[in-house]
Amino acid sequence: MGRECEITGKRTMFGNNVPRKGLAKKKGGAGQHIGVKTKRTFKVNLINKKFFIPELGKSVNIKISASALRSISKVGLSVFLKKNCKKIEDFI
């Protein structure tokens, strides 16, 4: 499956490195000059986490993003899965 969160579907994104030099006009400068833009990747912060599911009495290993882990710790795994239209059975 590669670098992808199994719950939210977050994956590697692509963008540009934009080097800037000079002081912004707001700060009293002559304005910023943008140099040559080069391609780069924004990788997802993935974590392999083991969750215990009390309804099934089993533990499940899930590859999730750090932001999904924070949300799960706030609302719980079953509520977060329902919110993202996933079922617990998909991970067994």
Curated annotation (Swiss-Prot):
One of its GO terms (biological process) is translation. PANTHER family: 39S RIBOSOMAL PROTEIN L28, MITOCHONDRIAL, LARGE RIBOSOMAL SUBUNIT PROTEIN BL28M. Keywords: Ribonucleoprotein, Ribosomal protein. NCBIfam families: L28 (TIGR00009). Transmembrane segments: none annotated. It comes from Borrelia hermsii (strain HS1 / DAH). SUPFAM superfamilies: L28p-like. This is Large ribosomal subunit protein bL28. GO terms for molecular function: structural constituent of ribosome. One of its GO terms (cellular component) is ribosome. Belongs to the bacterial ribosomal protein bL28 family. It holds the Pfam family Ribosomal_L28. It comes from the Bacteria. HAMAP family: Ribosomal_bL28.
